[in-house]
Amino acid sequence: MVTTLNRGILIQPLENLVKKSPNKIIFRSKNSKITAKDLFENSKSIALNLSQNGVTENDIFALAVIPSFEFIEIFYALLLLKVKIAIIDPEMGRENYAAKIKQLAPTWMFVDSRLLFLNDWPWIKRLFQRLHIPIPEIEIPVGPRIVKVGKAIPTKKVYFEIKNLKSNVLEKFNWSNSENPVDNVIVYTSGTLAEPKGVLHSDLSLATTISLLRAIINGEENDIVGTYLPHFMLLGVASGLTVRIMPTRMNAKQKIDWLNKNQINIMFGPPSEMLPLIIFCEDNNISFPKHMKHLMLGSAPVHQGFLNRLISVLPKSTKITCTYGMTEHLLVAIADGRVKAKYQSDGDLLGPIVQGVDIKIDDDDEILVKSEQIFSRYLHLPNREEWHRTGDLGSFDINNNLILKGRKKEMIIRRDFNIYPALYEGTIKKIPGVNEAAMVGIYDENNHDEILYLAIENSDPTVDGISNLLAKGAFSIDKQAIPDVIFKMNIPRKGRQDKIDRSAIVNYIKENKL
């Protein structure tokens, strides 16, 4: 039987790049590089080898792989096969990860070899924990077929290996051109509620977002994108730009040196990622690299105080773009960061709506959005509403800019991570001796981020070491949701439904200067 590979809308930019510039270096990392042609050929080989091993369009793949060009090869291979692809962060905590895997029920997984090594040798994992070496608190499920990715680390069990899937295959294949959108990419929202919220996107919705971002960046052939984010890697490929994969474990000096050495001139990140660089520049009386052409900010609120500090250490020629969107609809509005830093409004300037996006404000001032970018549905639901309710409150000003007024539902955005208190409070209350728990966030102007507080009501006054329990073990939670400050109090409640009074907790924190 001849395998059919899908020439979908996300595949076409890579195929066009290969025809135009087959030998262009499209990805560089510390010790390796790959051309557009080799990337495409490797992806086709992986797809064909998977097909020979029984993969069909009904299969579901979960990826637990670090961002790398190998990740992108895998991603393109799975697009070619029209399977469902789920990207799940392995550092989200044991219970959270297990709940998502249970809901997803993957038939295949691509897993980093280091995670497999620790999973196969539990005593080494326990040793790492005793030595306080940070490692993901997850267990690889039994059931899915596993492909080992990354470094050549020995494992007890025998797995498929990515290097073997890249080997040449003699099998002939046919191309198919999909006329309809293919629902194939699942992204789990960070810090979701008790029911895991897998957001299912189509290739059309993702391609539409990438096309819009490509126009916003307006890159030139020799521009170099610095990122560790998969969607910006895909954007680089679609734009024909070289992507240098940014190491994630660098201090501010190392990152500035890396930006200089690699001549990065396009960069994306949340404010929390930029803040250490700003502080380093301020302390050393230096600026960001002069060749920095475009800085894109998103994934978290971008406040004026932060922007003014950023502008003070940026070259005057560097363009700043602030993006507003969400997992369900990745790009809604954009604002020029230099304009936003000075803009006077009754709220937070989100900017003009991007092309093709429809917005309406309901009677409760909630922002509703729809366009070709919109997700297909939540994985656990059969369909979605026509308009996506963002949970944000907003309005338009006289300049037709979208202005953010606040949040409709309880959620704390810390760095680039959404924290829903109810999700974590349930886990914390399982700790013996903890009667009640309540999380609140208070924005700190100096750190340009939310300070996360956890109020504990104890039935056992000797309960202690909550931070350690939340960092590892049976009660571990997302590392981004581990509180900065933990304190004890009688949790206040209000109303007929006896809900936690979070405003009273915030007032208590401020009054007691916690």
What are these regions (language model features)?
Residues 35-37, 175-177, 184-208, 242:
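Conserved AMP-binding A3 loop
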Residues 49-92, 223-224, 418:
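Conserved AMP-binding/adenylate-forming
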Residues 152, 160, 266-268, 280-344:
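Gly/Ser/Thr-rich phosphate-binding loop
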Residues 412, 439-443, 453-455, 472-514:
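Conserved C-terminal "lid"/linker of ANL adenylate-forming enzymes
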Residues 206-224, 228-266:
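Conserved AMP-binding/adenylation subdomain of ANL enzymes
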Residues 7, 22-23, 140-141, 147-154, ...:
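Conserved pre-ATP/AMP-binding loop-to-beta segment of ANL
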Residues 267, 274, 371, 393-479:
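AMP-binding/adenylate-forming catalytic core of the ANL superfamily
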Residues 349-356, 360-387, 401, 417-419:
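Conserved ATP/PPi-binding loop(s) of AMP-dependent carboxylate-activating enzymes
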